A protein has these predicted regions:
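Extracellular beta-sheet/turn segments enriched in Thr/Pro/Gly and aliphatic residues
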Residues: 10-62, 70-72, 191-258
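Tryptophan-paired
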Residues: 1-6, 57, 66-204, 209-212, ...
């Protein structure tokens, strides 16, 4: 950056964080004690920087989305989870205008063109759950756009096939092998062509609450990934909220109370 020559907007455009490693280390059971602080952004205007100048509170916003797994099905054990088709880079800041003025309260996506999207099973983030649900505070990801339901079999990069999703591996009571289910980030209560896909928004929490498992999944993770057009034997409820607006949430499997 050049003093007096680099505009704020130009500087903001260079503030991109890339995932390295691709799985965000959150000091979870799979991170071997590693932890990478989550970048946050906030700003406030002051008349000048001086000892006597009081600086007001600064509202900070996390640049990542968090995904938690809950399971209320007594005869089903979640063994492992894969985060698939995720972006591996993101802007540090929420959206800004041509003058570099940031709208910290904006709910709009702010995704760099060079987002290093990781598509498919091979680069997927692996999480060993081993029945320890709820599985919380371990899965983080950069912002990503909602899938586009073309309803025409178009499997381009923005379609349902390559949308951010989870592959959940588990067993029902009595089963001797792990099977896999695809879980998409969709609006609860709608089916077929009316399904609404949700984006992954910064500073938001997404709780995947498994409510029913009526049959086995696929014996292969790739088959599960390709099952985006097939009704799943795993039913879930997706709860999502902005962590700035709702601090504490209680969920009993049917109703949610947020404060």
């Amino acid at each position: 950056f050049g003093k007096g020559s680099t505009t704020k907007a130009a500087a903001m455009a260079q503030m991109i964080h890339s995932g390295d490693p691709t799985q965000w280390p959150a000091d979870g059971p799979n991170d071997n004690g590693k932890y990478l602080p989550i970048p946050m952004y906030g700003e406030v205007k002051v008349s000048k920087l001086a000892y006597a100048v009081s600086i007001p509170d600064i509202n900070m916003k996390r640049m990542l989305a968090r995904i938690d797994i809950a399971n209320s099905v007594s005869n089903f054990t979640v063994e492992e989870v894969y985060l698939v088709n995720y972006n591996n880079a993101g802007y540090l800041s929420p959206v800004w205008d041509a003058n570099g003025v940031v709208d910290i309260a904006s709910g709009d996506l702010n995704i760099p063109v060079a987002n290093d999207k990781k598509v498919g099973i091979d680069p997927a983030n692996y999480h060993l759950v081993a029945g320890n649900t709820p599985y919380v505070g371990n899965i983080y990801t950069f912002e990503a756009s909602a899938a586009v339901d073309d309803a025409g079999g178009n499997d381009g990069a923005a379609s349902r096939k390559d949308a951010v999703c989870l592959i959940v591996g588990g067993r029902r009571t009595g089963e001797t092998s792990t099977t896999y289910y695809r879980v998409d980030f969709t609006q609860t209560g709608k089916t077929g062509e009316d399904v609404e896909y949700l984006p992954s928004l910064r500073n938001h929490k997404y709780i995947i609450s498994i409510t029913e498992v009526s049959g086995p999944g696929y014996d292969d993770k790739q088959k599960a990934l390709e099952s985006y057009t097939v009704m799943s034997n795993l039913k879930m409820r997706l709860i999502t909220y902005d962590r700035d607006k709702i601090k504490d949430v209680v969920y009993d499997g049917q109703y949610m109370l947020g404060v």
